[in-house]
Amino acid sequence: MPLKPGSRVLVGSSGAAQGGSPLSGGYAGAKRTQIFMVNYSQKESDRLGLDLRFTALAPRMIPDTDLGKHAVAGYSRYLGISEADFVKSMASPPTSSDVATAVLEVVTSSDHSKGKAFVVSGKGLEAVT
């Protein structure tokens, strides 16, 4: 079924879409593709006057989740440093709460001018350029 005018589509991407990933390059590429698809979809919606909003959220690594803990362990091993040192080296990693707040902010905002894809860090949302 077609989406109703005013509908929003939120795609869960990853911060790996921005910087790549030496441990999982295919994953990073797939997540970047999601951002391309959101941009293409928004352009088509605008062109056809469908009044749909497509947004991608790309959280950076979230150390307080099970997946994040595995990622921290893998990257720290790869780099030959402790997990604590790896986490300290991360620039403003988001928490689960930061990501939840970002989701709410994006789906409740009526301001379409801020962008279509956002990285989520501990500092909040940053538009992907």
Model-derived regions: residue spans:
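A generic alpha-to-beta junction signature in SAM-dependent methyltransferases
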Residues: P2-L3
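Catalytic loop of short-chain dehydrogenase/reductase
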Residues: G6-G49, A58-T65, K69, A73
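A general secondary-structure boundary signal
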Residues: R8, R53-T55, S110
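Conserved short-loop catalytic and cofactor-binding motifs
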Residues: G25, A56, V87, A91
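Rossmann-like NAD(H)/NADP(H) cofactor-binding core
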Residues: L50-L57, K116
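C-terminal helical subdomain
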Residues: S76-T129
